[in-house]
Amino acid sequence: MSRQNAGPGFGPGIVVVDKPGAMTSHDVVGRCRRIFGTRRLGHAGTLDPMATGVLVIGIERATKILGLLIATSKSYAATIRLGQTTSTEDAEGEPLASVSAEHVAPEAIAAAILDLTGDIRQVPSAVSAIKVDGRRAYQLAREGQTVELAARPVRIDRFELMDLRRGADVIDIDVEVDCSSGTYIRALARDLGAALDVGGHLTSLRRTRVSHFDLSQAASLDELAERPALSLTLDQACLLMFPRRDLTVDESQSVGNGRPLEPAGIDGIYAASDADGRVIALLRDEGRRTKSVVVIRPATM
């Protein structure tokens, strides 16, 4: 997808960054603030430092829709090592145990993957950002404290084995995963290894999609530094993410002033736009009236 030129005075929009490894999501936000010359900037969905791939950045008023993106489905390409467990459930942790996976058959791996597909309850990773008594779980884990997190419902729509390589007592498998928000791929690696009685951890992770935004729209930080550009304007992003409802002039004014409309009969959130395709607000039908989810263009603008 072509990107929209950005520079001083550019409008609000979305930038899809291909996050490099060895950077935190916060580091990427800091770099983008310098590139785009604004502090009003945020991201949707944290990626671990070792992970690469899609990180959606909202600029200026586009930060208003980031919360809606965090709750959407995501896709990943990952490599899982069977036969070793680590303290962080990924390659950055200390080795905890090694159990030979030499005897594990591909059919057993496929069966264990199938058991972890669909609606499941997953215990989040102990080194997650979930808060426990006001502190992040990963902070407690790094201090050597035992972290017990409750299992949560998640949905794994696709968990597919793409390749398998045998090494000395370990098996490396490449997988692709489509999942709901709140799914921890590290926890999938942990649980897959546990199901096979050999342990497992994540050795690489690349996010390939967040909602409607994927790697085909992504730019590297170096590319953005050379040519700052939006992946999509705020209007384009809203119309890509949600169904469209066309408004009359009077309806546009009402929505811009925060007044409800007659329902549209559209399930979920939809983008209410004027005749020029400018999104006035994201709305939801509630009973006999609409409810504003996000007002994109208030009447005061």
UniProtKB/Swiss-Prot annotation:
A GO BP entry is: mRNA pseudouridine synthesis
Keyword tRNA processing recorded: yes
Alphabetic keyword roster: Isomerase, tRNA processing
Q: Which domain of life is it from?
A: Bacteria
**GO MF, one example:** tRNA pseudouridine(55) synthase activity
- The Enzyme Commission number assigned here is 5.4.99.25
Catalytic residues of the enzyme: 48 (nucleophile)
> What SUPFAM superfamilies has UniProt attached to this entry?
Pseudouridine synthase, PUA domain-like
Q: Which InterPro entries match?
A: PsdUridine_synth_cat_dom_sf (IPR020103), PsdUridine_synth_N (IPR002501), PUA-like_sf (IPR015947), PUA_sf (IPR036974), tRNA_psdUridine_synth_fam2_C (IPR015225), tRNA_psdUridine_synth_TruB (IPR014780), TruB_C (IPR032819)
**Which reaction is catalysed here?**
uridine(55) in tRNA = pseudouridine(55) in tRNA
Q: What does this protein do?
A: Responsible for synthesis of pseudouridine from uracil-55 in the psi GC loop of transfer RNAs.
Q: Which family does it belong to?
A: Belongs to the pseudouridine synthase TruB family. Type 1 subfamily.
Descriptive protein name: tRNA pseudouridine synthase B
What species does this protein belong to?
Answer: Mycobacterium ulcerans (strain Agy99)
